[in-house]
């Protein structure tokens, strides 16, 4: 019987993958045969996670700060330089604020919106040619946007 979750031959990018939900998603993809790129702005955590996940398959770490447009474009460029096709994009990077609602500064709001909204839009549009190239009529490529309240705890 073939493995229902076999995704061999596919390539994925998981952002915010140094820990938590992102690391768990990357683990599942690797165990299903996917070459998986992981990214995070926290370099030490990212490469530690890469080392752990490499036991499951080909895991490549790229350090990137997606809170800026330049960081998004830089990550997309590195992916496009390495992979002509991207079958799966998991937009998981995110942040929350560290202030009470009534004291919340505009700079904090901008940071949250840049990472949680703008970065996933621009990363998707930057990688769209690679995503379209991976898609077929029988097997479309996937973009998954993740939201969580993990940062609130």
For each of these PLM feature ranges, what is it?
Residues 92-97:
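Conserved NAD(P)H cofactor-binding loop of Rossmann-fold oxidoreductase domains
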Residues 100-101, 105-110:
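Substrate-binding pocket helix/loop in short-chain dehydrogenase/reductase
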Residues 148:
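Residue(s) in the substrate-gating loop at a strand-loop-helix junction
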């Amino acid at each position: 019987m073939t493995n229902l979750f076999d995704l061999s031959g596919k390539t994925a990018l998981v952002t915010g993958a140094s820990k938590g939900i992102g690391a768990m998603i990357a683990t599942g993809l690797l165990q299903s045969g996917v070459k998986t790129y992981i990214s995070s702005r926290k370099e030490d955590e990212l490469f530690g996670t890469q080392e752990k996940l490499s036991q499951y398959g080909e895991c490549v770490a790229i350090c990137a700060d997606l809170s800026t447009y330049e960081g998004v474009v830089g990550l997309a460029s590195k992916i496009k330089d390495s992979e002509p096709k991207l079958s799966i994009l998991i937009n998981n990077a995110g942040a929350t604020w560290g202030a009470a609602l009534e004291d919340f500064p505009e700079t904090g709001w901008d940071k949250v919106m840049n990472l949680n909204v703008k970065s996933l839009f621009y990363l998707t549009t930057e990688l769209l040619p690679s995503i379209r190239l991976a898609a077929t009529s029988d097997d479309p490529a996937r973009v998954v946007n993740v939201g969580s309240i993990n940062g609130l705890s």
